[in-house]
């Protein structure tokens, strides 16, 4: 960015945890970029929520919303001409209760003010290939059918290949 080596028609993407100091540094690092996607994530799976973070569903949802609101605030206040897009991942989506994943993503869509004209990319990872391809596809189908703000979202599948089923998971998820 500093040396102006990124062509104007190229979009760069950055990944940030839903943590205030990291979000602030991430947005700051984009100064001078023409087009950028800020990809926010936080873990939402039952196991990580209960064992690693020792937080409730509501606390995890609030973490995602607070991160999204901060990104929205910082990019609205941004001193530059960067064209920002946003992406959100409920990390370990396939280990998250389906209705909880839907609710979190709807809340993030609202916090970012995403619309049919300015869609949020919603990345749905099958982290460490936690479930079989058919189960992952069922989760994608449930998610897409139940997302309240479906018109304001681009669904991005993110299969892993830890057990060698990544291609099958991707193909079935696309069919969902």
Predicted regions and their residues:
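Short acidic loop-to-helix transition motifs that present clustered carboxylates
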Residues: 17-22, 162-166
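Short beta-strand segments
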Residues: 15, 39-43, 158
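A general secondary-structure junction signal
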Residues: 16, 126, 159-161
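Thiamine diphosphate
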Residues: 158-176
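Alpha/beta enzyme core
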Residues: 1-7, 20-153, 169-171, 175
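A glycine-rich helix N-cap at a beta->alpha junction
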Residues: 8-16
């Amino acid at each position: 960015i500093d040396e102006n080596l990124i062509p104007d028609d190229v979009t760069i993407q950055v990944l940030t945890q839903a943590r205030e100091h990291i979000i602030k540094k991430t947005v700051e690092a984009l100064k001078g970029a023409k087009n950028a996607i800020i990809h926010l994530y936080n873990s939402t799976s039952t196991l990580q929520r209960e064992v690693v973070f020792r937080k409730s569903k509501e606390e995890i949802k609030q973490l995602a919303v607070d991160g999204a609101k901060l990104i929205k605030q910082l990019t609205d206040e941004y001193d530059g001409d960067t064209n920002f897009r946003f992406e959100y991942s409920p990390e370990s989506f396939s280990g998250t209760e389906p209705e909880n994943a839907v609710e979190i993503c709807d809340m993030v869509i609202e916090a970012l003010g995403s619309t049919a004209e300015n869609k949020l990319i919603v990345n749905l990872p099958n982290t460490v290939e936690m479930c079989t391809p058919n189960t992952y596809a069922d989760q994608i189908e449930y998610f897409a059918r139940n997302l309240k703000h479906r018109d304001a979202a681009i669904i991005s599948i993110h299969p892993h290949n830890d057990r060698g089923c990544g291609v099958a998971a991707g193909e079935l998820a696309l069919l969902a």
